[in-house]
């Protein structure tokens, strides 16, 4: 069965992470819109291959969906998958921190649900030539949008040793960042890096075997760091979560799945800030402008069940947070 599945196109094998749980969390936002006589509108801010969007469109026949992705290949695959719902979808090639501009272009004033499934997609991991995976040799690219921007090869071949230490330590949380950066600089002096295999070989040579046994593949953290740097993932996320909050209608919900602590920290910070009163400490009365915008729906982060991980092993590291808007938008 596994071999047969592996032979199928990625789009056919794709199982959306925590699909039912995400949709159940978003559903009350759509119902709030209906009660006001409005047609519910959702944004899938990280469309990928459209699995979550397809499930939402199937479950909610009145839903209009805006799908956003920076990956043109993913956008094309999702477009084919969502063709039966083409009269209820707008698919946009954009980065998800551009929510405000996307909605402005579409003439959509606000939305009732936003889903963000962060990190690298199944398509990007499975398409070898994209260079996201360390398990096989491929061009050292790692761009989510292959039409623009620097590649991972540009980073490893051109960044100074200090810059490499900084990003590998900060974005990869790699304790051997110094050794790895030094090895990269020495190796590229002889021959510039062109493939993932060449990079993995050099990383293996300096990461102790004992550390690899306890911490997973020795290149895992460095590849994460390079991917984040190439795609400016955390900078985008820092802009995207506030943009999502600003675009969400009263009673609407935002659901975010993150896959490592750096992502979750950003999401948590924005959600917590929006869920607290802004009244000065000791202020006798909470004025309307001081009331929180958001209500936390999940208790901290929710994690996958054993059944959800069995359905999709890539869900294992997922961390889910959800909030609801409980205060009118400033421009509403």
From Swiss-Prot:
Catalyzed chemical reaction(s): cytidine(1402) in 16S rRNA + S-adenosyl-L-methionine = N(4)-methylcytidine(1402) in 16S rRNA + S-adenosyl-L-homocysteine + H(+)
Record-level GO BP terms: rRNA base methylation
Enzyme class, spelled out: transferase
Domain of life: Bacteria
Record has Transferase as a keyword: yes
Pfam families attached to this UniProt entry: Methyltransf_5
Keyword S-adenosyl-L-methionine belongs to the record: yes
Residue ranges crossing the lipid bilayer per the database entry: none
List of residues binding S-adenosyl-L-methionine: 50-52, 69, 103, 117, 124
Places the protein is found: Cytoplasm
GO molecular function: rRNA (cytosine-N4-)-methyltransferase activity
EC number(s) given by UniProt: 2.1.1.199
UniProt keyword annotations, A-Z: Cytoplasm, Methyltransferase, rRNA processing, S-adenosyl-L-methionine, Transferase
Gene3D superfamilies: Putative methyltransferase TM0872, insert domain, Vaccinia Virus protein VP39
GO CC term (a single one): cytoplasm
Family label: Belongs to the methyltransferase superfamily. RsmH family.
Record function comment: Specifically methylates the N4 position of cytidine in position 1402 (C1402) of 16S rRNA.
Full protein name: Ribosomal RNA small subunit methyltransferase H
UniProt organism field: Paenarthrobacter aurescens (strain TC1)
Organism phylogeny: Bacteria, Bacillati, Actinomycetota, Actinomycetes, Micrococcales
Gene: rsmH
